[in-house]
């Protein structure tokens, strides 16, 4: 998984998630992302079943609480044997450090910076800052790096900024990936797999472009080809 492409399993339940995954041949299991919708609906059993079937799992819960609580949550989630887990960088340096200590190197921790759905104006108003999105992502990445996390989540448009200030092995995972003929949905800061690669992304998260396609396998293969 040098340059993983995660399919976001944004489905309401286990059955619809596996109905989708069964469209892929058994020898071509994609890496998958499980977010709040599916995890909160099904609980740990969705992760357990995915792992039993050989899927590599990225658990996207964006943990954001006081350091003690986040550390305890990370320790609990280690039992699920997922490969990646998200925390939110806005929780601060101490929270991220606590998560890193709790992970004990057994899981890749990814710090979410700014959501791909947020605009510059909304970020400034909500977070009461005069910074640009690029400045904010750079600052949050520097904190994440200081805390010892394994990588960040940002829009592909900020991947190059992150690449410039982090080591080569620091993961730069980018959602907000669309093909040229796709609708943006609720994401604002988006680009294509090819452009994300040019910007320096080391991994992609792709949801609706694949899950809502008439031929998901072909679209998945096309994205892999563009990104490799």
Curated annotation (Swiss-Prot):
<feature type="binding site">
    <location>
        <position position="178"/>
    </location>
    <ligand>
        <name>substrate</name>
    </ligand>
</feature>
<dbReference type="InterPro" id="IPR011060">
    <property type="entry name" value="RibuloseP-bd_barrel"/>
</dbReference>
<feature type="active site" description="Proton donor">
    <location>
        <position position="62"/>
    </location>
</feature>
<feature type="binding site">
    <location>
        <position position="208"/>
    </location>
    <ligand>
        <name>substrate</name>
    </ligand>
</feature>
<feature type="binding site">
    <location>
        <position position="116"/>
    </location>
    <ligand>
        <name>substrate</name>
    </ligand>
</feature>
<dbReference type="GO" id="GO:0004590">
    <property type="term" value="F:orotidine-5'-phosphate decarboxylase activity"/>
</dbReference>
<keyword id="KW-0665">Pyrimidine biosynthesis</keyword>
<dbReference type="InterPro" id="IPR047596">
    <property type="entry name" value="OMPdecase_bac"/>
</dbReference>
<dbReference type="InterPro" id="IPR018089">
    <property type="entry name" value="OMPdecase_AS"/>
</dbReference>
<feature type="binding site">
    <location>
        <position position="207"/>
    </location>
    <ligand>
        <name>substrate</name>
    </ligand>
</feature>
<keyword id="KW-0456">Lyase</keyword>
<dbReference type="GO" id="GO:0044205">
    <property type="term" value="P:'de novo' UMP biosynthetic process"/>
</dbReference>
<feature type="binding site">
    <location>
        <position position="10"/>
    </location>
    <ligand>
        <name>substrate</name>
    </ligand>
</feature>
<dbReference type="InterPro" id="IPR014732">
    <property type="entry name" value="OMPdecase"/>
</dbReference>
<dbReference type="Pfam" id="PF00215">
    <property type="entry name" value="OMPdecase"/>
</dbReference>
<comment type="subunit">
    <text>Homodimer.</text>
</comment>
<comment type="function">
    <text>Catalyzes the decarboxylation of orotidine 5'-monophosphate (OMP) to uridine 5'-monophosphate (UMP).</text>
</comment>
<feature type="binding site">
    <location>
        <position position="187"/>
    </location>
    <ligand>
        <name>substrate</name>
    </ligand>
</feature>
<dbReference type="InterPro" id="IPR001754">
    <property type="entry name" value="OMPdeCOase_dom"/>
</dbReference>
<feature type="binding site">
    <location>
        <position position="33"/>
    </location>
    <ligand>
        <name>substrate</name>
    </ligand>
</feature>
<dbReference type="GO" id="GO:0006207">
    <property type="term" value="P:'de novo' pyrimidine nucleobase biosynthetic process"/>
</dbReference>
<keyword id="KW-0210">Decarboxylase</keyword>
<comment type="similarity">
    <text>Belongs to the OMP decarboxylase family. Type 1 subfamily.</text>
</comment>
<dbReference type="InterPro" id="IPR013785">
    <property type="entry name" value="Aldolase_TIM"/>
</dbReference>
<protein>
    <recommendedName>
        <fullName>Orotidine 5'-phosphate decarboxylase</fullName>
        <ecNumber>4.1.1.23</ecNumber>
    </recommendedName>
</protein>
<feature type="binding site">
    <location>
        <begin position="60"/>
        <end position="69"/>
    </location>
    <ligand>
        <name>substrate</name>
    </ligand>
</feature>
<comment type="pathway">
    <text>Pyrimidine metabolism; UMP biosynthesis via de novo pathway; UMP from orotate: step 2/2.</text>
</comment>
<dbReference type="GO" id="GO:0005829">
    <property type="term" value="C:cytosol"/>
</dbReference>
